[in-house]
Amino acid sequence: DVERSRGLGDVYKRQIMSSEPGTITLVPTGPLTNIAMAVRLEPRIVRRVKEVVLMGGGYHVGNWSAVAEFNIKVDPESAHVVFNEDWPITMVGLDLTHQALCTPEVQAKINAIGTPLSAFASGLMDFFRKAYKDNQDFIDPPVHDPCTIAYLIDHSVVATRRCPVDVEIKGELTVGMTVADLRGPEPSAEECHTQVATKLDFDKFWDLIIDALKRIG
């Protein structure tokens, strides 16, 4: 049973605490409410989680405000909790996902697979192509969440930069901003537990996606 006031925090807590330490990677692709609640309910989960690879944030621009991305903006307090715990975090934000554009050439490869799933995926791209053009003036639609999984499958698909990251929760104009300190030399993993995704290997990424669509059939 899910207690309304705790959301899925209890579920996260039970699953992590009942698993071997270092065997669970959290891959949130939405607001971080449930993970923050789990941490508050059972702080020991932080040491048991292998890493957190999240889709959210951005160190240059936002999409829900000038500086804030939707997943962080809608619950910045929870994001602040998650980023300030001492577990390894990779932030796959808009700076990276806006490079994962479904160009007409990519969509043609998806269509060529010729399965119901590939037709469904292509239809989604048609919808998002129009939506992104109308609302954000993108020529081609970006895909966001798959970038996190691509990184986990093959780290070489996504280049990263280690740097301190925090979430603004008080600014009049900047609530929900993920503030990445990219100044100076890159710190070591021992010095800094957060890193941001910076550059996508476009061809390798779409090869992974198209291969997955073919495998699923």
Predicted ranges, named:
Residues 30, 82, 149:
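Divalent metal-coordination and catalytic microenvironments
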Residues 10-41, 53:
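Internal, conserved structured core segments that host functional sites
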Residues 36-41, 63-68, 92-94, 101-107:
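A short secondary-structure junction signal
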Residues 54-55, 90-94:
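Short, conserved beta-strand edge motifs with alternating hydrophobic and charged residues
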Residues 43-49, 83-86:
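Short, conserved loop/helix-junction motifs that constitute active-site signature segments
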Residues 9-10, 33, 37, 53-56, ...:
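Active-site glycine-rich loop that binds ribose-phosphate moieties when present
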Residues 73-75, 92-217:
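Conformational coupling and interaction surfaces
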Residues 1-12:
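Single conserved hydrophobic/aromatic residue that forms the stacking wall/gate
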